């Protein structure tokens, strides 16, 4: 990646919330009811930190109903059922999960850290906790000649779950990526 990951301090988050409250009041004059945490996948943060962020959001925006953000399947797996339920109660809802595919062959090759069964299990846990979610599907990730197989595997998994929506993005291969090297070596075809 062209940047390194770092967590924002709670002081920075509070400063952002103060500024957002000031601007929202000036621009809209309406109560803000939804926010979306940005910057990679904030759901990777520990439960306690997510709860503190929710508390701060509700302090500055008392009418806040939902808090969304990007998440990975592995982030969900790191949280207990009780924590997921508490996060739901704190307003977390409408996560955007980059599942990319439910094609196990592609998931293994891309070293995503999860398989189709994990998508089913972890999103089922979100369903039980009352946390809604949407998916990003990545066309092309299954490789040359495997697009239909990847789409069918993904549809089979997605149809067992309850995503609010499924968005499709195209695979982009960067020259400094591991996938680009695999293509150069002849191990994967676009």
PLM regions: where:
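Canonical Radical SAM [4Fe-4S] cluster-binding loop centered on the CxxxCxxC motif
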Residues: 1-15, 19
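Conserved SAM/AdoMet-binding glycine-rich loop
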Residues: 22-132
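Short linear capping/connector segments at secondary-structure termini
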Residues: 34-40, 138-141, 184
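C-terminal accessory regions of radical SAM enzymes
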Residues: 179-190
């Amino acid at each position: 990646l062209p940047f390194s990951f770092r967590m924002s301090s709670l002081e920075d988050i509070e400063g952002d919330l103060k500024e957002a409250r000031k601007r929202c009041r000036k621009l809209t004059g309406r109560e803000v009811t939804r926010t979306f945490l940005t910057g990679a996948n904030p759901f990777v943060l520990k439960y306690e930190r997510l709860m503190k962020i929710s508390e701060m959001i509700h302090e500055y925006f008392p009418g806040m109903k939902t808090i969304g953000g990007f998440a990975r399947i592995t982030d969900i797996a790191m949280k207990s059922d009780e924590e997921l339920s508490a996060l739901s109660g704190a307003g977390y809802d409408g996560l955007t999960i980059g599942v990319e595919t439910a094609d196990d062959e592609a998931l293994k090759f891309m070293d995503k850290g999860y398989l189709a069964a994990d998508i089913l299990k972890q999103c089922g846990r979100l369903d039980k906790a009352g946390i809604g979610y949407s998916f990003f599907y990545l066309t092309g990730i299954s490789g040359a000649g495997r697009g239909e197989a990847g789409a069918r595997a993904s549809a089979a998994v997605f149809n067992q779950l309850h995503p609010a929506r499924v968005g499709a993005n195209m695979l982009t291969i960067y020259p400094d990526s591991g996938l680009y090297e695999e293509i150069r070596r002849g191990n994967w075809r676009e």
